[in-house]
Amino acid sequence: MKKLSALIFLFFLTLISTVNAANFVEGMEDVPLMDGLSQITQDDISFGNEETRLLEAYLTSRRLKFAAVANFYRESLPQLGWIYQGNRGNNLLFYREGETLEIIKESVKPLIIRITVKSKP
């Protein structure tokens, strides 16, 4: 009976971990994925080494507006250490420990945004 209980516990622990992992942009464990956005994974870019990195992800939604997405990231990213630097047109800029994060509106209908994380040399 104890073995069965342990197996059930491990199953639920794995399930919870999988659900939590789904709440972040794939490949960017420090960038949350807003409800209503889905990731276009075939367009992701990821490369780097011990000193620098470049990550790029595309997200899309047919029902969200960019203003709601911008508000979500302005509120949530500072909780993960990102410091909001302001807007540059339709771009949101954040900075954290030698890295920049940029959120760019690529299109309106459907909404497509690009999130880029770059290390500063």
Give each language-model segment a name.
Residues 2, 20-121:
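An acidic-aromatic pocket/loop used at catalytic or ligand-binding sites
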